[in-house]
Amino acid sequence: MSSQNPVWTTVSTAPDMLGESPFWHPTEKMLYWIDIPGKKIHRASLDGMVTEGWDMPQEPGCIAPAKRGGLVIALRDGIYRAAYWQSELVKIASIDYDTTTQRFNDGKCDTAGRFWAGSMFEPRTERLAALYRLDARDTVEHKKPPKFDIVQKDAILANGLGWSPDNKTIYWADTVDQIIHAWDWDEATGSMSNKRVFQKFDAKPAGWTPENTMGVNYQGRPDGCAVDTQGNYYIAMYDGQRILKFAPSGQLLAAIPTPTRCTTMPCFGGEDMKTLFITTSSFMRPAEEMKAQPLAGHVFSMQVDVPGLPVNFYQE
């Protein structure tokens, strides 16, 4: 089930603390991603000729491109709109959680143009996180506020959001619970039904090390995801130094080794959508690990055989 010796290329010019939320912009031919604790949005061209950063006033949890141009950005205290790169940030939705203990984390747009963002409870002790849906379609012409709803509750650390190519299935993970759920998905209404377990992973017991597995098949913690055109689901396993590729049936197809231990999120890009990008983390990692993996926090890429789904754009 293991992928054979993938060849990874370093894309970024400097490491992030916690790289996340990558997407490939097909028009600009640029890769975007964020550094959450670094409070920054990055973008870069594949040839390395363009590498730019944009400082944020708060931690960005996730970003997505907008059809009218610019970005939609989930910051700690709400959802913001930027009309173009480094433009003014305009808040379009406020959040009702306690911003001292919660922030947005993983998120992206669906094919209808709604923006979905999951939150996390930073102490990781209570189920106060949720999945939010922002529907701003037709709001500009009709001068009305977007609809901002809670779709799912009772999570701790939201991650792994993705959709199947036929728009019939939605995936969402809770990193702390070591679980990925799937639901039936209605693109027209944005509704979820028929919740079921897609994958459940072994937790990391106290004292576990790569050398002393204690008989537990610990593979890391489920983080961000990407989906290819065949419906295969790629999940970054934080602390596991791998990406797991699952068929729509749930069958494990491959375990792809990654350059650093803490891979955070994959995405597809490039002209043919056969470049797999990954963001990684160096945040609060042990000194010995950082010494052994000096490229932790960088963005990497490798080539794959099956193209991925393109990024969905925010519509308003």
Each language-model region and where it sits:
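A short loop-to-beta-strand structural motif that recurs across blades of beta-propeller domains
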Residues: 40-42, 78, 129-132, 179-181, ...
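Flexible "stalk/tail and boundary" regions
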Residues: 68-69, 84-85, 132-142, 240, ...
